[in-house]
Amino acid sequence: ASDAPYTSSLGSVSISGVSLEWSAYLGTPDTFTGSFECSDEDLTQWWYDGVYTVDMGTDVFLANETEPRSASSPTLEGKQVLFDGAKRDRDPYVGDLAVASLTSYLSHDFAKSSRSVLEDLAQHQRSDGWIPPASINNYGLPLFDYPLWWVVCSVDLVMYTGNTSYANTYWNTLKKALDGYYAANTDSATGLLYKNDTGYGDYAFLPRSGPVTYYNALYVHALSYASQLATSLGLNDDAERWSSRASSVGKALLSHNFDQSVGAFYDGGPCPGAAAGTYCNVHSQDGNSIAILAGVTNDTTSAQILDYWQNATSQGYGNAFYDSSILSPGDQFNSRVYAFISYFEIAARFATPGQASSAFDELRRLYGWMASHDPQITMWEGIGPSGAPYEGAFTSMAHGWSTGVVPLLTGYVLGVKPQSPGFKTWRICPVVDGGGLAWAKGEVPTPQGKIEVSWERDNVQTGVIFTLNIETPDGSSGVVCVPTLGLDNPTISMDGAAVNVSSDPTSGWASVDAAGGKHVFTVEA
């Protein structure tokens, strides 16, 4: 060739140095305001792996680095946001925040990335009250459930961070979603939400229509949670209206959608090609789990649902999100596991008396599988048949919605949850049975300072078989649930003095009111 003196098929390149620009949130020891540790090293590691997964997805929204399907948005440009995944899709979806934001609040107390997303979506609310799920498709992706997740995540933001100014600013947005959009999509004959079209409408892009259990259970949850916040803010009319509606929808859901033959809720819509108004013989993890957490079912029915689900869907890598693939046979729904929705099932197990062992079992199967397979330190978007990434190489392997292990361990094993904005009131109800744990300790950030909790099982020979230490901010108050450990009449002491409390053998706890400050609780046989 004419350029032969100047080119060659062989050669070498010398590199004198390599550097990496880390643009995501850099979690270092000094940025952690929350923590978790327990006697099971795996659980401890998974808590921090979950935080790292969310750190990787926390970044500045830039037009040339985000989802290419018309997701670039000048109202988000340059803001800290919480993306759904570190590499894919690189767009902040509000449903993902239902888990990912909790992980962020409980680890670094970093709310800016979540607030940016929630505020931006509120500002794009449609005139009928619908709120877009993300900026993708020019804020036009037609998901039916995500306005409810906006409500839930907005309440989370206020409860965990104390940002009541956000609530005041966007209260009418919240009301318009609950009282406008969803009220207009309610079947007056049944009192249930009814999705008319069969196009995709939720987090998994499922072809569901009709009085779908998941949509209605999530509606009950959103109404109840918004009512709780309204009460804290002194908005009693809103609180009463939403609480009443939540109760009515919950009763209608039990009346119309519960399948007595298996002891679980139907998915709620027709089978493919079947007539509208019929119920397909299929059941889903999302609706059943959230119905339990929303208080639709009593403890007996909740346990019945959870026992069925364990028997019908258990895999070595978690529990599948459907008990059948009839809605889309080629997609093998009965072998697909979403850690996102599994969060709600595991939470339902922790919240249901007698189900703690199954909660720890599912937690260990799910997160143990991801931790023992490449990349080992981040949580996957979804798991498919045989435990492989559910969309092959296209699967996001660092997805914030899959980090439920963080709020599960903090919210149930430590037992710390806010009851009013900014943890001004709180509950500390640790689940100490079922997981084989000898001790656990950790910290939870609040606007007034940290809540510190540690508990341990003691040597039975000393007479004291359990000790719980808490320290909460001055001026706060709450309820402490002291585990009775199966004892019929234990001696429970608070700060060295016996307290006269009645224990509930069903829940396995004795409830004690406590003011802020340091307290030590002991249980003696």
Language model features with spans:
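Structural helix-adjacent loops and short alpha-helical linkers that scaffold large soluble proteins
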Residues: 4-11, 41-43, 105-119, 125, ...
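Substrate-binding groove/exosite segments of carbohydrate-active enzymes
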Residues: 1, 12-181, 285-288, 336-340, ...
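Surface-exposed interaction regions enriched in Ser/Thr/Asp/Glu
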Residues: 2-21, 517-525
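Short, hydrophobic/amphipathic alpha-helical patches that form generic packing surfaces
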Residues: 102-107, 291-295, 407-411
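Catalytic cores of carbohydrate-active enzymes
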Residues: 64-82, 86-95, 99, 132, ...
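Extracytoplasmic low-complexity repetitive segments enriched in small/polar residues
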Residues: 4-5, 17-24, 32, 36-38, ...
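Non-catalytic C-terminal accessory modules of carbohydrate-active enzymes
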Residues: 356-525
